Amino acid sequence: MLADLPIALNPHEPTSIPTQLTEQIRRLVARGILTPGDPLPSSRSLSTQLGVSRGSVVTAYDQLAGEGYLSTARGSGTTINPDLHLLKPVEIEKKETSRSVPPPLLNLSPGVPDTATLADSAWRAAWREACAKPPTHSPEQGLLRLRIEIADHLRQMRGLMVEPEQIIVTAGAREGLSLLLRTMDAPARIGVESPGYPSLRRIPQVLGHETIDVPTDESGLVPRALPHDLNALLVTPSHQYPYGGSLPADRRTALVAWAEANDALLIEDDFDSELRYVGMPLPPLRALAPDRTILLGTFSSVITPQVACGYLIAPTPQARVLATLRGILGQPVGAITQHALASYLASGALRRRTQRLRRLYRHRRSIVQDTLGDLPNTQLRPINGGLHAVLLCDKPQDLVVTTLASRGLNVTALSHYWGGTGADNGIVFGFGSHDEDTLRWVLAEISDAVSLG
């Protein structure tokens, strides 16, 4: 057995940790570094070596065993399948390079949470239970136990009453939106906020729908400016992206009235709703119009995006249509992951974790405000919730982004979030995933980069 498998995982890639691990073990086999009969580390040992959850390793091992790469036997551990037929190992040509590869940038992507304290006893216990008693079947809508726990979680955390049969388990907001849009006749006219989340803007276009930019201000969507010929409207009422406005009650009422008058579907992205630092969050839009609203939810901000699990809530008739389509396309979230999340939710650990994260992020938010709040020639937009900040500046945003990249920091130009012209000048950066010392260093670099001096 190799003392340490030559594997390097990147938690900030869009590909999940189990998928990265699966691909890299396949590659080691293809290159002849791992050969038939070679023993592999136990899931516990490899998870410790790589600094990932044991559940991620178990999921990867299960996938590889199903593909015939691995063999597992009680008492003898996990090995590369002795009967695996291999092609000649691929020799990878080593090319000389005239310059060194630049080091990876420190990830300041918006929405990345702090996972340093995630792997506590409740999290480990949930994955142990899921791996010890893996489900044998996952319904199209997702495990009933998980849907029951999601319904209870929403009742306690968001004051929302839903039934398990109205819930579809998804691989996150983007996947849930994609599933929903596949049930709509193309080309539908889909209203999207401008500025808004770029990938949620692109998904309708990829599926053959037309996107129509709708304006926002410091409070979010502006209902009076909505056109009357939209089939659906994608809206973030709890935490508008990226500016963070929360849609006030009068606008919510006006939005529901607009939807009813125009027979339009409201697609509510409940992004960052549980991470609010000022006042109490308003109930979801779905509470006002349950028969006209589809709610997209995810656990990425309070657990980790690498879990790749979320939910979609629809009126019962539409939920049946979505479940039928899900049965055709397949359930993208593994049953073991669903079982582990159900156990984690049932233990109450996620509610306790969310409370701890609010305190942690509120402190980091204060550091951002204290450092950047009074910088000359800039304006720090209010941070009422979420894991990112928006800093308007007089210095050209592309120059700021380039300067910070040269110092090993990746921030996003504010214009990235606009569908067309009229973008404000500034940057967007996440502050949730790094410790206090790192955050203070990052903010000092940002302060210097936006300076006109």
Curated annotation (Swiss-Prot):
Entry protein name: HTH-type pyridoxine biosynthesis transcriptional regulator PdxR
Cofactor section: pyridoxal 5'-phosphate
TM region(s), chain numbering: none
PANTHER family in alphabetical order: HTH-TYPE TRANSCRIPTIONAL REGULATORY PROTEIN GABR (PTHR46577:SF1)
PROSITE patterns: HTH_GNTR
InterPro entries for this protein: HTH_trans_reg/aminotransferase, PyrdxlP-dep_Trfase, PyrdxlP-dep_Trfase_major, Tscrpt_reg_HTH_GntR, WH-like_DNA-bd_sf, WH_DNA-bd_sf
CDD domains per UniProt: AAT_like, WHTH_GntR
Gene3D superfamilies linked to this entry: Type I PLP-dependent aspartate aminotransferase-like (Major domain), Winged helix-like DNA-binding domain superfamily/Winged helix DNA-binding domain
The organism's place on the tree of life at top rank: Bacteria
Sequence ranges assigned to domain HTH gntR-type in this UniProt record: 15-83
Lineage, top ranks: Bacteria, Bacillati, Actinomycetota, Actinomycetes, Mycobacteriales
Keywords associated with the record: Aminotransferase, DNA-binding, Pyridoxal phosphate, Transcription, Transcription regulation, Transferase
Species the sequence originates in: Corynebacterium glutamicum (strain ATCC 13032 / DSM 20300 / JCM 1318 / BCRC 11384 / CCUG 27702 / LMG 3730 / NBRC 12168 / NCIMB 10025 / NRRL B-2784 / 534)
Family per similarity comment: In the C-terminal section; belongs to the class-I pyridoxal-phosphate-dependent aminotransferase family.
DNA-binding interval(s): 43-62
Function: May have a regulatory function in pyridoxine biosynthesis. Is said to also have an aminotransferase activity in valine biosynthesis as a double inactivation of ilvE and pdxR results in an auxotrophic requirement for valine.
